[in-house]
Design a protein with these regions (language model features):
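PLP-dependent amino-acid enzyme catalytic core
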Residues: 1-413
Length: 413
């Protein structure tokens, strides 16, 4: 890969050749992929990019750690819609707001970006099997992307994973192991099995290439905004890989001169599990927390990518905002009713944090903001029903319907 120099440990600085099955440093630190920006600037321009018909994450190949001969993965991942939302911006009291709906990806979450990268690197490594642990989205994402590429998967999920997500990955033909325990127990089980059988490792905090896939959401946002950066970007945080990837994407664009400023990050976590945000708020090393939130995709008490996530938040002069489950469900309704965007609880936690930050005066009124919805609401129907409530139940009689409308104060226009 001419565009890649090496992998570098964010903890001790040791460097490694960027081989397809690259994992953690011997010191236990996470690796970062280091690029040759001078080379990239010589082969990629805004004009060249604008002429490309490829509307997927692979349109940014010069900024991705894949061989030139590696084909695009079969499913079209990326180039999700970015909606300008003036009504919601006015409601929040800010200048401009855009909502990036990554629930429109093939398996309905941002995790498809990481899984597509995992499949590409597994193909480069000649691997026939990929494995990971997941609270749900990474699992279904890997299962779908790997199925399309003809690669077998073994996926470990905690037993609390929503049935809809488990059903999705079962439909994709994954070998699913439901672990009686929390996410940390599940992660350890997957790591032991991967070590025993030699499967390709899709765990985001172990495989440094996955955050490179996730960073494509930032590359898209920048291009969709014609390279004019927002002041803030709000996104939900669990393991830490996504927010780290987003920051890496913006830094890459800044390094090659495509953008002239970097946004501040709004790190959104649930009050039921916020180890990364707590480290920011208390200015201390992160510590494990119990997992107790409806936002299952970010319910990670032992974040394996905390080092990169904390670096991203601090480098961006970011804001850490914790929200309750009730605030998350309220944000789910708000996005649905003002924007027509249906996100799962973890997917709308960024929007919930943005709303709270605006209410607390942390965001100036002249600010421009992008809020990323990381997963589709159909992934967690039970909590969607809890958020939205029940329909009006009546007998097939129009007069009874009119009476029920009166009782409920329903205004007919």
């Amino acid at each position: 890969m001419r565009n890649v120099k090496y992998g570098k440990c964010v903890r001790c600085g040791k460097t490694y050749d960027a081989v397809p099955d690259l994992t953690n440093c011997t010191c236990g630190g996470i690796l970062d992929i280091v690029y040759d920006y001078d080379y990239i600037k010589s082969v990629l321009t805004k004009e060249k990019l604008a002429k490309r018909d490829n509307r997927s994450m692979w349109r940014y190949r010069e900024l991705l750690p894949v061989e030139e001969t590696t084909p695009d993965t079969p499913l079209r991942v990326g180039w999700s819609p970015l909606y300008e939302e003036p009504k919601l911006a006015e409601l929040l009291g800010i200048k401009k707001l855009w909502v990036k709906d990554d629930g429109q990806n093939p398996t309905a979450s941002l995790k498809d970006r990481a899984s597509a990268m995992a499949v590409a690197k597994a193909m480069e490594a000649g691997a026939k099997t990929i494995a990971c642990s997941s609270t749900g989205n990474a699992a279904s994402s890997l299962a779908g992307n790997a199925a399309a590429a003809g690669i077998k998967t073994y996926i470990f999920v905690p037993e609390r994973a929503p049935k809809g997500k488990v059903a999705q990955l079962m439909i994709f033909g994954a070998n699913v192991i439901s672990v009686k325990g929390n996410y940390e127990d599940t992660f350890k089980m997957s790591a032991a099995a991967i070590d025993k059988y030699g499967w390709y490792n899709r765990n985001a905090a172990i495989n440094p290439y996955l955050s490179e896939g996730k960073k494509t959401v930032a590359l898209e946002i920048a291009e969709q905004l014609n390279w004019e950066m927002p002041d803030y970007l709000a996104i939900s945080v669990g393991d830490g890989c996504t927010i780290a990837g987003v920051w890496k994407g913006f830094k890459d664009l800044y390094a090659i001169g495509f953008i002239d400023k970097l946004p501040r990050l709004i790190s959104a976590q649930s009050l039921g599990c916020y180890p990364i945000n707590r480290a920011i708020q208390e200015d201390k090393p992160w510590e494990p927390m119990e997992e107790n939130t409806i936002a299952d995709s970010i319910s990670v008490g032992v974040p394996r990518n905390a080092d990169k996530a904390l670096m991203a938040i601090r480098e961006s002069n970011g804001i850490a905002v914790n929200v309750s489950d009730e605030e998350i469900l309220a944000a789910q309704r708000l996005l649905g009713r003002t924007c027509g965007v249906f996100g799962e609880p973890a997917g709308v936690t960024g929007a919930a944090a943005l709303k709270k930050a605006c209410e607390e005066g942390l965001i100036p009124h002249d600010a421009t903001v992008v809020s990323v919805v990381t997963g589709n609401g159909l992934k967690d129907v039970a909590n969607a029903i809890k958020s939205a409530g029940e329909p009006i139940h009546i007998e097939p009689d129009l007069e009874l319907m009119v009476e029920e409308f009166k009782k409920r104060g329903v205004t007919v226009e």
